[in-house]
């Protein structure tokens, strides 16, 4: 069930679902596992907000256990392709692809609430079938591992070797630890706004 917000204006009452109301404030919410369906919605919202105002920041709130690498890379590429800065804010959990997207926000505008958890690791996968099919899948997951690690190294300022070692297994961090690591820039208690810039 999605809550509805009622707004009253000179033209009467108008009902919005909560996500549409947040979109008016340039807030996009990724609050579940990253899958093709919700990744497409995030991409569409980012493109819409760029068309509305290409200069004004967009706020991407993330509370996600991770998910599909290809779907997440679609969001990542869109974040980098559009003109507005995308400020990322972790609320609750940003794990796996969620942490990757958190770190991909505009430099200086990657944030977390103080009690959030952030986790990085290597991509997960599995294969079955003939030996040749398994070999193809193994090559693909190794390619994705190298790609994600290189981007994480770029986002954090860490060496590729350090990122590769740290993502070998689940690596959980507090908000402060993820700031020290370079995944985020700030631990915040209040939401940034136009009157209270980052």
Curated annotation (Swiss-Prot):
Tell me which residues this entry annotates as catalytic.
96 (nucleophile), 121
Residues annotated as coiled-coil are none
Annotated Gene Ontology MF terms?
ATP-dependent peptidase activity; ATPase binding; serine-type endopeptidase activity
Keywords, comma-separated and alphabetical: Cytoplasm, Hydrolase, Protease, Serine protease
> Per the UniProt record, which residue ranges are transmembrane?
none
EC number in record: 3.4.21.92
User: Which reaction(s) are listed as its catalytic activity?
Assistant: Hydrolysis of proteins to small peptides in the presence of ATP and magnesium. alpha-casein is the usual test substrate. In the absence of ATP, only oligopeptides shorter than five residues are hydrolyzed (such as succinyl-Leu-Tyr-|-NHMec, and Leu-Tyr-Leu-|-Tyr-Trp, in which cleavage of the -Tyr-|-Leu- and -Tyr-|-Trp bonds also occurs)
Q: Which PROSITE patterns match?
A: CLP_PROTEASE_HIS, CLP_PROTEASE_SER
Query: Looking at the record's lineage, which domain of life comes first?
Result: Bacteria
Describe the protein's quaternary organization and the partners it interacts with: Fourteen ClpP subunits assemble into 2 heptameric rings which stack back to back to give a disk-like structure with a central cavity, resembling the structure of eukaryotic proteasomes.
Into which family does the record put it? Belongs to the peptidase S14 family.
What is the recorded name of this protein?
ATP-dependent Clp protease proteolytic subunit 1
Question: Organism source for this protein?
Answer: Synechocystis sp. (strain ATCC 27184 / PCC 6803 / Kazusa)
């Amino acid at each position: 069930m999605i809550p509805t917000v009622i707004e009253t204006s000179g033209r009467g009452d108008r009902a919005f679902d909560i996500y549409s109301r947040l979109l008016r404030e340039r807030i996009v919410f990724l609050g579940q596992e990253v899958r093709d369906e919700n990744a497409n919605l995030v991409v569409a919202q980012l493109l819409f907000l760029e068309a509305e105002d290409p200069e004004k920041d967009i706020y991407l709130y993330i509370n996600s256990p991770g998910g599909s690498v290809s779907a997440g890379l679609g969001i990542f590429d869109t974040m980098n392709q559009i003109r507005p800065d995308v400020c990322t804010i972790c609320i609750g959990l940003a794990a796996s692809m969620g942490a990757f997207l958190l770190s991909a926000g505009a430099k200086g505008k990657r944030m977390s609430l103080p009690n959030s958890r952030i986790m990085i690791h290597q991509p997960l996968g599995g294969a079955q079938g003939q030996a040749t099919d398994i070999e193809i899948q193994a090559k693909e997951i190794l390619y994705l591992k190298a790609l994600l690690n290189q981007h994480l190294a770029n986002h954090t300022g860490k060496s590729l070797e350090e990122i590769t070692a740290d993502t070998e297994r689940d690596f959980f961090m507090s908000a402060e630890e993820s700031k020290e690591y370079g995944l985020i820039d700030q631990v915040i208690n209040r939401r940034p706004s136009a009157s209270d810039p980052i």
